[in-house]
């Protein structure tokens, strides 16, 4: 062999090390920067228009459910609490993402949402690249535009919620899998493992992709030596370990247990697999007779059942065992439930979580217009046609098919929300792009037979995805209830009542909405209406401690202190962590003259709600009544430190200071009280 030939052979071997050949076909058409920019800008303009419009919805700044939890968590991170407490219950990536943004930009929810829609628009451009690499430039363009105009994607991208990271990380991982940059295999596979690990810290069920990618490493590189495949697998696993093990160590050090992600497997599995389950989250309320089975609630109920304190891992194991017991006892019922959940995953309706897609459609012109046709039902039909028309290439596409099936199964095994299936969307968009382009080609070529088969597949898929099992494609009771809470925080009580009433009209047995109506009517002084809805809430959710406490408050304020105290005590027995129940009990005891007995529940209320001024104020009032002036003054001062605009505390402190002859200070607090009460 000549020296020149030897150099060429060495170069070829080196290139192969840097550029592993895969069974996924390389693009037949070069992707171009202009199309990247066009798709990105189209997606961005649509999402920006949507963002401007939804600022009018009360939920934009008054977050609900997980969004509020993530935001509060992020604020603690931005304030310096980087490690937190206990084993993670919810996946941590998005709260830390938010926390870093809030550390840099402050608590600016509009700007954060804008940055998120930039990521969403980038993901549309990435889908174009992936589609061009897998199929053709035309298919890539179609796939990118499908995602750009897909109404639920526009909705999810602008929420304070982790779906945006699910989308972006999955698209980036697919790009690395396809090796656009011809990266050295060490960098590539460590990157793939790291991105999948990050995706698992946002959407835990995505870790089901780990064995699929590992399998593909071994069977998808047919032209590479067997010896090189373990090295690739090792790099992939190293990337996973690099991301997940530090989280596990953090959980071990802070929470006492080594968990690679979170400790919510058991409760989540039970929510989706129990005798009352119907495939959605809300069904578990019928079983536990409470509002939710989350974090502290899951722990409290498990500890009550076991009779001792439990670690997060033990709590998860308890609920997992409860679900498995149900499956063993009623296997036929569980299989029917599993089939129902599988169909719900593919149903056209976006099953609502804290934020209801269909309520946002009422505020957003892009969602209103695009929602008529650019929804999951259309996407699934287009993707089914694309899968059929691309089936001849199944050997090089099997990983993508397997990812779709695995992600869908990982949702169905638990329970279904629209956002839980969102990671399916970019994968389906790829095949939707193929379906559009190939169907157009067949039409131009007048290839009627394959077009007829494609039409049959479209119709069959449409029947399945539009089967009436997920409810109407309209706002749900939970969405209206959360809207009512947001209106209430804005001080718009009438609008809040109207929204909560709509929730009850949609779902008369929705106890949470009855509870909120009770609170709203009590706020307006409409006692009989409040009594009626509190009663209905407690009939539906007798173990709801907050409802017991607030109904007791209504009774106590109406003069029936004895009945009120019974409800306060029941609330505490159900959930001793409800500070309001302790506060209400302490106030009621004080009103009956049982001052000494009132101190303990008021102190407990202050301990449970350290940011609340009311428990400290009432303690000060009791100390003052007992002539313990020093303790009373300290309590009133502390209450005002917590809440400077608390007029009753200013007035009580003024009276106390006057009794002690401190007339100048008393006058200042008296004047401040008058100013605040005007």
Please give the residue ranges for each predicted region.
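Short helix- or helix-capping micro-motifs
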Residues: 43-46, 143-151, 175, 196, ...
């Amino acid at each position: 062999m000549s020296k020149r030939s030897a150099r060429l052979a060495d170069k070829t071997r080196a290139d192969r090390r840097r550029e592993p050949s895969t069974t996924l076909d390389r693009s037949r058409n070069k992707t171009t920067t202009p199309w990247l920019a066009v798709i990105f800008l189209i997606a961005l303009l649509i999402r920006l228009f949507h963002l401007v419009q939804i600022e009018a919805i009360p939920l934009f700044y008054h977050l609900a459910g997980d969004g509020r939890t993530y935001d509060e968590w992020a604020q603690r991170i931005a304030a310096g609490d980087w490690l937190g407490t206990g084993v993670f219950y919810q996946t941590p990536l998005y709260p830390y993402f938010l926390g870093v943004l809030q550390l840099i930009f402050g608590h600016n929810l509009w700007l954060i949402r804008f940055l998120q829609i930039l990521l969403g628009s980038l993901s549309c451009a990435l889908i174009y690249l992936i589609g061009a690499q897998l199929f053709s430039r035309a298919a890539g363009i179609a796939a990118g535009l499908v995602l750009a105009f897909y109404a639920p994607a526009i909705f999810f991208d602008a929420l304070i919620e982790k779906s945006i990271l699910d989308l972006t990380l999955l698209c980036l991982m697919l790009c690395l899998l396809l090796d656009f940059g011809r990266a050295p295999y060490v960098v590539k596979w460590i990157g793939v493992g790291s991105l999948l690990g990050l995706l698992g810290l946002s959407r835990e069920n995505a870790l089901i992709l780990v064995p699929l990618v590992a399998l593909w490493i071994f069977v998808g590189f047919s032209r590479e030596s067997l010896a090189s495949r373990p090295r690739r697998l090792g790099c992939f696993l190293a990337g996973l370990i690099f991301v997940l093990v530090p989280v596990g160590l953090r959980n071990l050090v802070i929470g006492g247990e080594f968990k690679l992600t979170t400790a919510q497997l058991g409760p989540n599995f039970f929510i989706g697999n129990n005798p009352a389950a119907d495939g959605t989250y809300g069904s578990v309320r019928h079983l536990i007779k409470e509002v939710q089975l989350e974090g502290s609630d899951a722990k409290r109920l498990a500890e009550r059942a076991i009779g001792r304190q439990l670690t997060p891992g033990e709590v998860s194991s308890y609920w997992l065992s409860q679900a498995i017991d149900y499956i063993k006892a009623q296997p036929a019922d569980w299989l029917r439930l599993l089939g129902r959940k599988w169909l719900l995953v593919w149903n056209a309706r976006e099953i609502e979580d804290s934020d209801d897609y269909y309520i946002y459609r009422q505020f957003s012109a892009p969602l209103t217009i695009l929602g008529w046709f650019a929804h999951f039902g259309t996407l699934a039909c287009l993707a089914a046609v694309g899968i059929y028309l691309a089936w001849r290439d199944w050997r090089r596409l099997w990983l993508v098919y397997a990812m779709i099936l695995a992600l869908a199964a990982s949702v169905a095994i638990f329970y279904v929300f629209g956002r839980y299936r969102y990671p399916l969307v970019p994968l389906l968009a790829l095949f939707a792009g193929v379906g559009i382009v190939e169907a157009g080609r067949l039409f131009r070529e007048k290839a009627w037979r394959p077009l007829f088969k494609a039409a049959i597949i479209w119709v069959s898929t449409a029947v399945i995805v539009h089967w009436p099992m997920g409810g109407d494609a309209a706002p749900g009771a939970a969405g209206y209830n959360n809207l009512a809470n947001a209106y209430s925080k804005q001080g718009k009580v009438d609008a809040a009542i109207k929204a909560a009433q709509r929730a009850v009209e949609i779902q008369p047995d929705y106890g949470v909405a009855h509870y909120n109506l009770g609170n709203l009517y009590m706020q307006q002084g409409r006692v009989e209406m409040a009594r009626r809805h509190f009663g209905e809430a407690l009939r539906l959710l007798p173990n709801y401690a907050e409802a017991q406490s607030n109904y007791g408050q209504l009774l106590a304020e109406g003069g029936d202190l004895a009945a009120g105290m019974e409800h306060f005590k029941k609330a505490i027995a159900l959930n001793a962590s409800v500070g309001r129940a302790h506060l209400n009990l302490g106030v009621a005891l004080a009103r009956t003259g049982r001052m000494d007995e009132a101190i303990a529940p008021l102190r407990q209320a202050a301990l449970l709600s350290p940011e609340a001024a009311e428990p400290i104020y009432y303690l000060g009032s009791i100390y003052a009544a007992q002539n313990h002036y020093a303790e009373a003054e300290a309590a009133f001062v502390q209450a005002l430190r917590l809440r400077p605009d608390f007029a009753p505390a200013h007035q009580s402190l003024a009276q106390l200071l006057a009794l002690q002859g401190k007339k100048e200070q008393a006058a200042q607090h008296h004047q401040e009280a008058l100013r605040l009460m005007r």
